[in-house]
Amino acid sequence: DSPIWVLADKNRIRQVFVNLINNSLKYGKEEGSIEIRFYDLDKNMLIEVADDGIGIENKHLSRLFERFYRVDASRSRDKGGTGLGLSIVKHIIEAHDQTISVRSTIKVGSTFGFTLKKG
């Protein structure tokens, strides 16, 4: 397998990874796991950060990337954070003319996926 290059600002993409992985650690199970998966698509690379944490109810998914939105404000206070992380992630990915998505199941976990253009 040869490397696949993407067109991206490495510092901003590092921030995307840090935010997504931190969320997985923050809301994951004590003995849980995090998977980072890479898929070679036609013109893009799809990258997924998946955990086996608490999951997110469907009613919250459409608002997750809003500034200051928190699924459970009381839990967020215990875990720390500002409610800006996912909004920043979305902004960075969209600044690269790409997309981010989320799917989640309660008590099973969440998967955040984003694309980057291959270069």
Question: What do the predicted segments below correspond to?
Answer:
Residues 24-25:
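Short helix-loop "hinge" at the ATP-lid/N-box region of the Bergerat-fold HATPase_c
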Residues 55-66:
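Short helix N-cap motif at coil->helix boundaries in the Bergerat
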Residues 31-43:
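Short beta-strand/loop element within the Bergerat-fold HATPase_c
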Residues 97-98:
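Conserved glycine-rich
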Residues 13-14:
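A residue-level detector for a conserved hydrophobic packing site
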